[in-house]
Amino acid sequence: MRIGILGGTFDPIHFGHIRPALEVRDKLNLDRVWLMPNHIPPHKASTCVSTEQRLEMVQLVCDQYDEFDLCDIEAKRDTPSYLVTTLKQLRDEHPNDEFYFIMGMDSLVSLPTWYEWRSIFTLCHIVVSERHGWCLNPDSAIYEEYEHRLTSTNQIPSQSTGLIIPIEIAPQPYSSTEIRHQLFNGIIPENALPSKIIKFIQHNSLYQAPA
């Protein structure tokens, strides 16, 4: 199978995660998209709710959208979530599948700071969600790698790993930080969250502390 992977804290999961993942799936004709909550993200100090609660929210989204599956491989760890470690484990467990890791251009730019970042290209393709008109700075540390591995959505990959596939994604004006801020102030961001997530947050009195 051809499987997309979208990782994140999902604190909380919102349409800014869901809609781009669906777009990537459709444009690349992927079989599935796995939503993969982090446990202890290396680039973030902590999350606002427990790992178990974030897993429950992601599972609610997977129950609503047949295209998604919950991947809890990182959430089960007691150590920081490094992508290369996760991908090695997934490749061992699913040797016949191709993985397409989905990230924003901001994450791609910072990729050279990630743990064993070059090894990531031996384990998956990288799908980069782009904003219209955005161009990668030639002075960026990732620029040479980007130019070397770049391919397009209308080219069928002849290899199972190692490509960078840019996809223009419809802008989503949602931010987890802003959503948490609204919830703390008693505002329900109905346009940003699926109804099941809103009900879960209200039932469990989540995000009652400042974001």
UniProtKB/Swiss-Prot annotation:
Enzyme Commission number(s) of this protein: 2.7.7.18
GO-annotated biological processes: NAD biosynthetic process
Catalytic reaction list: nicotinate beta-D-ribonucleotide + ATP + H(+) = deamido-NAD(+) + diphosphate
HAMAP family (alphabetical): NaMN_adenylyltr
Function: Catalyzes the reversible adenylation of nicotinate mononucleotide (NaMN) to nicotinic acid adenine dinucleotide (NaAD).
Stored NCBIfam families: cyt_tran_rel (TIGR00125), nicotinate (nicotinamide) nucleotide adenylyltransferase (TIGR00482), PRK00071.1-1 (NF000839), PRK00071.1-3 (NF000840)
Family recorded in the similarity comment: Belongs to the NadD family.
Annotated PANTHER family: NICOTINATE-NUCLEOTIDE ADENYLYLTRANSFERASE-RELATED (PTHR39321), PHOSPHOPANTETHEINE ADENYLYLTRANSFERASE (PTHR39321:SF3)
The protein's name in its UniProt record: Probable nicotinate-nucleotide adenylyltransferase
